[in-house]
From Swiss-Prot:
This is Capsid protein. GO terms for molecular function: DNA binding. Keywords: Capsid protein, DNA-binding, Host nucleus, Host-virus interaction, T=1 icosahedral capsid protein, Viral attachment to host cell, Viral penetration into host cytoplasm, Viral penetration into host nucleus, Virion, Virus endocytosis by host, Virus entry into host cell. Belongs to the circoviridae capsid protein family. Homomultimer. Assembles in the nucleus, presumably in an immature form, then migrates to the cytoplasm once assembled as mature virion. Interacts with Rep; this interaction relocates Rep into the nucleus. GO terms for biological process: endocytosis involved in viral entry into host cell; viral capsid assembly; viral penetration into host nucleus; virion attachment to host cell. GO terms for cellular component: host cell; host cell nucleus; T=1 icosahedral viral capsid. InterPro entries: Circovirus_capsid (IPR003383). Self-assembles to form the virion icosahedral capsid with a T=1 symmetry. This very small capsid (17-22 nm in diameter) allows the virus to be very stable in the environment and resistant to some disinfectants, including detergents. Essential for the initial attachment to heparan sulfate moieties and chondroitin sulfate B of the host cell surface proteoglycans. After attachment, the virus is endocytosed and traffics to the nucleus. The capsid protein binds and transports the viral genome and Rep across the nuclear envelope. Pfam families: Circo_capsid (PF02443). Residues 5-29 are annotated as: Nuclear localization signals. The lineage of its organism: Viruses, Monodnaviria, Shotokuvirae, Cressdnaviricota, Arfiviricetes. It is found in: Host nucleus; Virion. It comes from Human associated cyclovirus 1 (isolate Homo sapiens/Pakistan/PK5510/2007) (HuCyV-1).
Length: 219
């Protein structure tokens, strides 16, 4: 009987399965005595489509009716984020009777220039262009312009040159008139627009804020 070598059985180990570690999400809770709310404002604007038009989404706390109701019961308020929705009131655009130009949304944290072009709007970082019949949505971080002391040839001056994002505002006499900058709307001009043609837009501004340190239950 011929000699035969038994074949060695090789047992292969199954590779270790690596599980992807899930990252836990942590949500920062509002502190005791604090209250998070969403404030909303709704405005309507009309554009002469033969002219380049701009509209700032800047807002003051007094523009929200809920702010006056809540502010007296807290020490301060912090504005954390904003969402702007542009709702065109026209849903058709053609080359004869209802030609509608495009518009764009972009972040902007200071006063708008008096003269601007639509191409200038589009060159801004994070600018988004939409059809004139299309709903536009963009999120922003609210900011304020704070005054600081500067020194020039004429001596010391106070200028509003410092941008502060997600500002915390002490609730006092002037708190309701602080200007909050978020973004802006730029609307294209059409050289061949029908005479006296207009475009209409509704704008919804949602602002999230936290009222800090409740001091009273009374208005």
């Amino acid at each position: 009987m011929p000699f035969s070598r038994r074949r060695r059985v090789v047992r292969r180990r199954k590779p270790v399965r690596r599980l992807r570690r899930r990252r836990r999400r942590f949500f920062k809770r509002a502190g005791r005595g604090s209250f998070r709310v969403k404030l909303t404002r709704f405005v309507s604007i009309t554009q002469d489509i033969s002219k380049t038009t701009q509209f700032s989404f800047e807002i003051t706390p007094s523009d929200f009716t809920e702010f006056a109701t809540l502010a007296d019961a807290f020490e301060a308020v912090r504005f954390t984020r904003a969402k702007v929705t542009v709702l065109p009131q026209q849903n058709v655009s053609n080359n004869s009777t209802s030609l509608i130009p495009a518009y764009c949304m972009f972040p902007w944290h200071k006063e708008l220039p008096t003269v601007a072009t639509f191409n200038g709007f589009l060159s801004i970082d994070r600018a988004k262009c939409f059809r004139g019949t299309q709903v536009g949505i963009q999120h922003y971080v609210p900011s304020t312009l704070d005054s600081i002391q500067t020194k020039g040839a004429a001596g010391y001056e106070v200028q509003s040159v410092q941008t502060k994002y997600k500002p915390t505002i002490q609730i006092s006499g002037g708190a309701s008139t602080v200007v909050l900058y978020t973004g802006a709307l730029g609307m294209q001009a059409l050289s061949d627009a029908p005479e006296n043609a207009q475009a209409h837009y509704n704008i919804k501004i949602d602002m999230w804020c936290t009222f800090i340190n409740q001091t009273s239950f009374n208005k």
